[in-house]
């Protein structure tokens, strides 16, 4: 899907978002609009949203009522035909792939900690369950950055989309980048120390 098509979808959907979804929680709006920009139909998103308002899956009803966001997404995904096993396996496959992308175990742990504690983890699980690859997931993260209203965001400039209240959503892309830089610096320090010891 081209940036122009994504922009068109986002502008049209954002103008009428409250007619389709209860956006009292802005994070939810971001996810619904992100899914819409990925080409997921309104009917499928509505099915997920309906599950948010009336969770019927016994295994996760209490967690959903307690506000555990990740569990609530699992409930919603079951409403469109995915099983708990599907969701769990998707997450495991993603984290296994992620492990091969980092040299050290510490780097892997930092990355997974970041992804498990913010909206990125949810988007990765949804995207993976829908069969999307890393490049398309990156577009979703770019969209979230644009949705934050960050005028310095490359995605915001490309899509020419600026929203108010940028502090509502975590800047997951910057957080991830900072963690990666910190890990690389730590690895360089370790290599330098090892070289000194070897002398």
Tell what function each PLM region has.
Residues 2-31, 66-125, 154-198:
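Intrinsic disorder/low-complexity detector
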Residues 48-57, 140-148:
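Amphipathic alpha-helical segments that form the core helices of the histone-fold
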Residues 130:
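Surface-exposed, Lys/Arg-rich phosphate-binding patches that contact polyanionic backbones
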């Amino acid at each position: 899907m081209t940036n122009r098509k994504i922009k068109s979808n986002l502008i049209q959907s954002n103008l009428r978002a409250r007619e389709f979804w209860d956006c009292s929680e802005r994070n939810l709006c971001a996810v619904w609009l992100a899914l819409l920009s990925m080409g997921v139909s309104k009917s499928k998103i509505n099915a997920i949203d309906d599950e948010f308002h009336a969770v019927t899956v016994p295994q996760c009803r209490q967690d959903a009522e307690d506000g555990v966001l990740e569990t609530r997404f699992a409930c919603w995904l079951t409403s469109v035909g995915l099983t708990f096993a599907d969701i769990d396996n998707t997450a495991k496959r993603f984290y296994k792939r992620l492990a091969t992308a980092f040299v050290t175990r510490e780097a892997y742990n930092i990355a997974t900690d970041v992804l498990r504690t913010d909206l990125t983890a949810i988007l990765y699980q949804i995207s993976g369950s829908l069969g999307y690859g890393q490049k398309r997931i990156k577009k979703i993260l770019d969209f979230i950055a644009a949705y934050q209203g960050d005028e310095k965001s490359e995605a915001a400039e490309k899509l020419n989309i600026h929203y108010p209240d940028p502090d509502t959503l975590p800047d997951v892309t910057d957080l991830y980048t900072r963690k990666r830089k910190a890990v690389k610096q730590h690895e360089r320090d370790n290599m330098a120390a090892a070289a000194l010891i070897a002398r």
